[in-house]
Structures are given as C-alpha cells and as structure tokens.
C-alpha cells in the first residue's frame, strides 16, 4: 500500500512568486488527505495532476489566512468534477464559521455534502479501516493544532513453509491467512493466522506541525514518525522574533525530530524574509541537530515506505 506526501505550498505569511502558502497533501492507497489549504493550493494540485475529487478529508491547523485562503476555491471546484461523496473538514473553533460565511458570501454552488467538525485537541478526529488521525494542541497566537495520521499494525510476514507443514494448500487459503482469517487445512483442521505469520509489523506515521512555539509535548505526539512535516520559520539568530510571533526556529524543529526519533523531517512555513538561495541557513542549522532534515519546496514529492 503506497503512502506519499506532496508539498503543495511551503511558504508562511505571504505568497512569493516561487513559493505558495502552506499546504500538504497525503495520498494513501488512493485516498487523499489535505493538511491546510493556503493560497496557491489549487495551482499545485493542477500542476501535479492530483485529482482533488479524491480528497476525503481536510485538516486545518488554525484559521490564519495563510492556511485557509485556498479552501473556498477547492470546495467550489470540487463541484465541477462530479463529486458526490462528502468531504470532511476538521479544525479548531471558527473554521465552521469561515466555511459557512464563504459559501454564503461567494454564493458557492456545492453539489456534495460538506461536513465541518470543530475540534478540541487532543483527540482522535478521523478514523479509517486501518488508520486514525489525531489532533494535538500547539501554542500559537490563536488556537492551533497539529495532526498525526498513524496506521495500525500490519500482520506479520507470511511463512509459506509453515503453511505447507500445516497442510494448507497453496492458493486462496494462503491469502485468507495473511488477511487474518482462520482456514481449514486438507485434513479439516483449523489453522489460525498466528500459526503461519511472524511478529506483527508496525504501520507508518505521518505528522504535520506548523505555527507554534516549541513545546516538549509535541515530541511525544510525533514520536516515531516516518515523516514529520514541521515548520522551521526562522534561524536561531531570530529566536526572539520567533517567540514573539509564536513560531519555531529550524533548530527547534530539528530538536523535536531528534528527540522524537523520526525517520525523516522536511521543513515548511519559511519566513518570506528568506529567498530560496538563503534557505540553506535554516537547513544547516537544523542538520546540525538532526541530519535527516531537508528543505521542502513547492510540489515536492516524498515517498513514505514501510520499514519492513
């Protein structure tokens, strides 16, 4: 099952000619999840040829303009692609008012259900057959949350030799065992999945953190992430400015990644004071703490593979 992230916009505060505002799309086995929807989100979706008809849920960190101004257009255009499935929108207080006001003022034609749920973190906000999305509190100038999407454990590796020893014929019964179902062998005896499967294997974890002061509690929330998308807005020399605006420096983001033992971190939400040529300052500072750090850029594609 594939899991991959697309950085639709990596900028903070204001768009630049080469940098849209914050938005990340996560694709998991055909399902699409959008995290924030800043200005320019539609442009990246189109340029990447991603079918936003498949977006089933949108997760909003907070209601500052650089994280939500792309939403109305996404919702309107979804009506132009024959969408009938509902779309769920999760976010802190005011997100429902923003969506409803946008629909009314813009006289939006919507031909599918929009279900908006305001949340109080920490909590599980969205569940699927084999994953959960959890929200947790951040510390910004207004109510702000981070998110993790975490898969449940997978069955252990299938042992074909053991299946043969237990007289389970090759074919559909093997697949049933791998999917967790008991079967009958050639002698009519019951064979359980645990008899032919190894130790359970962990699923994958994706975390999204932006617009916050450094908080030790974030470390526990994102611990073990296969991919952490995290703001690194300022260099360390501007830490006082970061604190005043309730943002993090690149070093603080890297500290979270290191302490949480994440496999990979990509930074987003750069201050517009940095041109692309100047972003190396943020990268160098972050990598001095956590080498598995990289800079994101608009329309960047990141595979999130299983460890085993």
Question: Predicted segment positions?
Answer:
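Active-site metal-binding motif and surrounding structural segment of the metallo-beta-lactamase
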Residues: 39-90, 118-120
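Active-site neighborhood of divalent metal-dependent phosphoester bond hydrolases
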Residues: 83-118, 273
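General small-molecule cofactor/ligand-binding pocket signal
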Residues: 6, 90, 115-120, 134-136, ...
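Binuclear metal-ion centers of metallo-dependent hydrolases, dominated by the metallo-beta-lactamase
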Residues: 122, 214-308
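Active-site neighborhood of phospho(di)ester-bond hydrolases with catalytic His/Asp-centered motifs
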Residues: 35-38, 55-63, 91-92, 207-212, ...
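Active-site-proximal loop/helix segment associated with metal-binding centers of metalloenzymes
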Residues: 16, 131-208, 212-221, 227-229
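Metal-dependent catalytic neighborhoods of phosphoester/phosphodiester hydrolases
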Residues: 70-77, 102, 275-285
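Conserved beta-strand hairpin/beta-sheet module of binuclear metal-dependent hydrolase folds
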Residues: 1-48, 84-86, 147-149, 156, ...
């Amino acid at each position: 099952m594939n899991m991959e992230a697309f950085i639709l916009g990596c900028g903070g505060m204001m768009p630049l000619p080469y940098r849209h505002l914050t938005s990340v799309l996560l694709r998991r086995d055909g399902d699409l999840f959008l995290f924030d929807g800043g200005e320019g989100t539609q442009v990246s979706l189109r340029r990447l040829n991603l079918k936003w008809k498949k977006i089933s849920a949108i997760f909003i960190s907070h209601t500052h303009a650089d994280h939500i101004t792309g939403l109305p257009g996404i919702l309107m255009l979804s009506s132009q692609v024959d969408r009938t499935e509902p779309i769920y929108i999760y976010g802190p207080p005011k997100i429902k008012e923003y969506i409803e006001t946008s629909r009314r003022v813009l006289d939006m034609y919507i031909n599918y259900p929009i279900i908006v749920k305001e949340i109080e973190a920490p909590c599980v906000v969205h569940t699927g057959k084999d994953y959960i999305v959890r929200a947790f509190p951040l510390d910004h100038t207004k109510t702000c949350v981070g998110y993790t999407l975490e898969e449940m454990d997978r069955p252990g590796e299938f042992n074909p030799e053991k299946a043969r020893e237990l007289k389970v014929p090759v074919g559909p019964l093997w697949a049933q065992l791998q999917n967790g179902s008991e079967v009958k062998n050639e002698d009519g005896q019951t064979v359980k999945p645990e008899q032919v499967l190894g130790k359970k294997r962990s699923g994958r974890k994706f975390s999204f953190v932006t617009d916050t002061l450094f908080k030790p509690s974030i470390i526990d929330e994102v611990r073990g992430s296969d991919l952490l998308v995290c703001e690194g807005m300022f260099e360390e020399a501007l830490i006082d400015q970061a604190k005043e605006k309730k943002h993090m420096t690149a070093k603080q983001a890297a500290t979270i990644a290191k302490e949480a033992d994440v496999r990979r971190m990509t930074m987003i939400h750069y201050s517009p004071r940095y041109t692309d040529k100047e972003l190396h300052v943020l990268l160098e500072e972050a990598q001095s703490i956590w080498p598995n750090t990289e800079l994101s850029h608009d329309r960047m594609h990141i595979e999130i593979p299983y460890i085993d």
